[in-house]
Amino acid sequence: MKKIIVCLLVCLVANMYAERIEPIPFGDMESWTVRYIKESKLLGGKTKTLYALAPTDTIWKNGPYYYGKNGNPWATSNAYANVIGIEKAAGTMMPEKREDGGTCCRMNVELLGVRVMGMIDIEVLVPGTLFTGRNLEPITTAKDPYQNIDFGVPFTGRPTALMFDYKCIISPEQWVWYAKGMAKPKKQEGHDQAEAYIYLQHRWEDEEGNIHSIRVGTGYKRFAESQEEWVNGYRLPIHYGDITGESWYKDYMGFKEMQRAVNSKGKVVLIQEEGWDATLEPTHMVIMLTSGRYEAFVGKAGNVFWVDNVNLVYEN
């Protein structure tokens, strides 16, 4: 019996040293910038609070926030908009205290209402999202929300998994809201879910400024049911190369047609994913943690996704 116990302990210690866990900067959710935005009088003139996962700071003025400073890879769905001089703040991602101490990130799916001049009600559906890249403020139009997002950050590693703590509240109802703000919100068939994914991409830019990409690694998970107790140290495996032939592959794990990045000319352009290759060295990493799986303005208000302690796992 003693020999068996010793062997088990040896195996446990060997496994511990067979891998290493590297924190992603600010991924412990303990540092936040708080922004206070005073909305235009036309919208009621209230002061709204926006949060950024960033060095601890407080900003008491309207204006764009410049993501990507101080080695910070994170951006959020929280945004400051200035449309022909009308200023508005929208925030569905925020810090929240954990029951056993520390701080986590809470992401809500919300129908955000705007009352113009006290008469016209406008509602838009906004999921809370945390991602690697930049949100390019100010937002000047709602026609194409992706034109203000620079997806991904430079990265050359080859991790085996994305690791994080999570819990979620997911409605079982089989309908979602479509609410773009131009008309009354409509119900349509669907089931909204929280989502986590990581892409490792090899990118390059051609002479015309187009950004091309080969998918090197993929990790993807949708959370279809509520998990109201914390799951600590959840691991999302990263699979290298072409995953389309795997039994667990789903179409949504494939190439994203709407994601964009800023090219060397300072222009936001589509990221043209063109193939799979496990042998290439990654140049960029895209991590997305979001309370809703649908495109902009579609989802189930009331869903919530909490995350904490976001790390990368490597083999030694």
Residue map of PLM features:
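Extended, low-complexity, turn-rich repeat/linker tracts enriched in Gly/Pro/Ser/Thr and Asp/Glu
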Residues: 168-175, 186-191
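A contiguous catalytic/ligand-binding core that recognizes phosphate-bearing ligands
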Residues: 151-156, 169, 178, 182
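A short secondary-structure junction signal
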Residues: 174-179, 208-211
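Bacterial Sec-dependent N-terminal signal peptides
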Residues: 1-23
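Generic recognition of cysteine residues
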Residues: 7, 11, 104-105, 168
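Aromatic (Trp/Tyr/Phe) and Gly/Pro-enriched flexible surface segments
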Residues: 19-159, 163, 189-241, 250-316
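Substrate-binding/catalytic groove segments of enzymes
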Residues: 174, 243-250
